[in-house]
Amino acid sequence: MEEPRELSATEIESLRCDLETLSRELTAQLEANADAARPVKLDQTAVGRISRVEAMQGQAMAQAGQRTAKLRLDQCRNALQAIERGGYGLCRKCEEPIGVKRLRAKPEAPFCLSCQHAVDQR
C-alpha cells in the first residue's frame, strides 16, 4: 500500500489538467443528458402501460446519472479551488495526504481511503 505523501508541483499541475478535463466532460454529459432526466410525458402513440413504465425507469436512471455527474462536477470544482488555496491532496476530514495513486484514479477525491470508507459506512 502506498504511503501517502504531499504532492510535488509537477503532480499538482498534472492533476489540475486532469480535473479541468474531467470538469469539461462532466459539464458536457450533464448538458447532453438533461432531456432524458426531464419528467416523462404521456405518449398516446406508445403501446400500453409497459411503455410508460419503461420510460419512467429510463428517466429514473437518467436522473441518478445526473445526480452522480453533478456531485463529481462539484467535487472537481472544489478540488480546483483547493489547488488555488494550496490545500489540494489533503483529506477534508483528517487533513492527512490523500495519496498520489488515489488522486490519479479519482482526482476529485475529497477524502483519503480510510475516511472515504468511514463516510461510505454511514
Question: What would you call each of these model-derived segments?
Answer:
Residues G89-R92, P110:
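Cys/His-enriched microdomains
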Residues L19, C94, L103:
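Residue-level signature of catalytic and energy-coupling elements of molecular machines
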